[in-house]
From Swiss-Prot:
PANTHER family: PECTIN LYASE SUPERFAMILY PROTEIN-RELATED (PTHR31736:SF19), PTHR31736. It holds the Pfam family Glyco_hydro_28. The keyword Manganese does not apply. It comes from Aspergillus oryzae (strain ATCC 42149 / RIB 40). Pectinolytic enzymes consist of four classes of enzymes: pectine lyase, polygalacturonase, pectin methylesterase and rhamnogalacturonase. Hydrolyzes alpha-D-galacturonopyranosyl-(1,2)-alpha-L-rhamnopyranosyl linkages in the backbone of the hairy regions of pectins. Its EC number is 3.2.1.-. Glycans are attached at N53, N91, N106, N241, N256. This is Probable rhamnogalacturonase E.
Length: 432
């Protein structure tokens, strides 16, 4: 549903319950790169790889892991590499992968699964010392033929104390980066760029105590999205640059999400600024903080929807057709303790906008205050004048058009700014 324009948001604070939002402990690898290099460096060129974009690099990486997976650095020097054998590294400890080259998917390979998978183990780091390392999935070779069930790029599963940073993930045939049941991790200084179609998710994450910051995503589906089984996340300085937008979704049976912070989220020409999607199921979502959102040209702004179902594109591109604030909760189990404040929204088309609330209690927008009442409700509030502070800045790197699905997508340069006025927490590795 990524049609043209919707609204502009200058600042938004949404608070559910009382969380201040934070990590529960330290994140990132337990030992430094220099410590790992002091143990051993395994250059993939010594294990049969060649940087000619013709010879498979997958098996040489796995061979290098045999020597460096229990302590050391697997080094992929600058140059172009072809991957035909998908990489699966299991239960490594105190090791890193220094990806300074570019890995290209073999266009004739029909294997599914993840091109690059790290599972189990601890104290792991995937990074580029030049900030120019990348994985190029060449997904357009699938997409131009209408195929979207295809390989994914990067998977981190059940790993503790880890980081991924200073690399680009480009044109995934399916998902770009999936984090499953990982803990104490950090993701930063990344650029993810995919085609303009659903199912090409940027980052999907579940686990405990994870910090994701200073990341740019371009696609038409999830930007940075939290999945069930997520706790103690801090997600900030995120640049959804012509994307699907950030979300919390696939919340079905056994939902269990708590202590999640989204802060400093800039959303340009996307489906939504933030959406929580569910339809039935059971479980609990609690203690969420959404703070400092800026958006331009988005189809939806804040959409908490417990009646989500597949929808056709909504006609119209104004705030009356697409409510910028929409909080829809179940009749049997309403949402409580929601605070919406300091919100400045206005439509880019038309002269009015609506807020829609249903069985949601708290303060702000169209919420009802009395959650002790057993009466269900649904209400629509119409706003006919622009708030005084709704105008917001833009970013210099805002895209003027999406990338299609029938041509190669260029590898982007990782930006040095991900949110207006916010300095990234870490300088690019390649800047030193």
């Amino acid at each position: 549903m990524q049609s043209k324009t919707f609204s502009v948001l200058s600042s938004c604070l949404l608070l559910i319950a009382t969380v201040q939002g934070q990590l529960s402990g330290s994140v990132g690898p337990s030992t430094s790169i220099s410590d790992k290099k002091a143990v051993k460096t395994c250059n993939v060129l010594d294990y049969g790889a060649t940087n000619d974009n013709k010879t498979d690099v997958g098996q040489p990486i796995m061979n290098a892991f045999e020597d460096c997976g229990s302590g050391g650095v697997i080094y992929i020097p600058e140059g172009d590499y072809l991957i035909q054998e998908w990489v699966s590294l299991r239960n490594g400890t105190a090791f890193a992968i220094q990806l300074d080259g570019v890995i290209y998917r073999n266009g004739t390979t029909t294997s599914q699964g993840y091109m690059f998978g790290i599972s189990g183990g601890s104290d792991f780091e995937l990074y580029s010392s030049t900030s120019k390392g990348a994985i190029q999935g060449s997904g357009y070779l699938y997409h131009m033929n209408g195929e979207f069930t295809a390989p994914r790029l990067l998977h981190i599963s059940d790993v503790s104390h880890w980081s991924v940073h200073d690399i680009a993930l480009v044109d995934a045939p399916m998902f770009h980066f999936v984090i499953d049941d990982a803990s104490n991790g950090e993701v930063y200084n990344m650029a993810i760029r995919g085609g303009n179609s659903g199912g090409l998710d940027g980052i999907d994450v579940s686990g405990d105590n994870i910090w994701i910051h200073d990341v740019m995503v371009t696609n038409k589906d999830e930007c940075v999205t939290v999945k069930t089984g997520s706790h103690n996340f801090q997600i900030e300085n995120i640049y959804c640059n012509w994307s699907g937008g950030c979300a919390m979704d696939s919340l079905g049976s056994g939902t269990n999400v708590s202590n999640i912070v989204y802060r400093n989220i800039y959303t340009w020409n996307s489906n939504q600024m933030y959406m929580i999607k569910s339809n039935g199921g059971d479980g609990e979502v609690s203690n969420l903080l959404f703070e400092n959102f800026i958006g331009h040209g988005n189809a939806y702004s804040l959409d908490l929807d417990s009646e989500w179902s597949s929808m056709d594109t909504v006609d119209g591109d104004d705030g009356e057709s697409r409510p910028p604030i929409r909080v829809i909760c179940p009749e049997a189990i309403p949402c409580t303790d929601i605070t919406i404040e300091d919100v400045d929204l206005w439509t880019e088309e038309g002269d009015s906008e609506t807020y829609v609330c249903k069985n949601a209690f708290g303060s702000g927008a169209c919420l009802k205050s009395d959650s002790s009442s057993t009466a269900t409700y649904a209400t629509t509030t119409t706003v006919t004048s622009a708030p005084s502070g709704y105008s917001a800045t833009t970013m210099a790197a805002d895209l003027t058009s999406a990338f299609g699905t029938d041509a190669s997508i260029p590898i982007p340069t990782i930006p040095t700014s991900f949110y207006p006025g916010a300095t990234p927490y870490s300088a690019l590795a390649g800047s030193s």
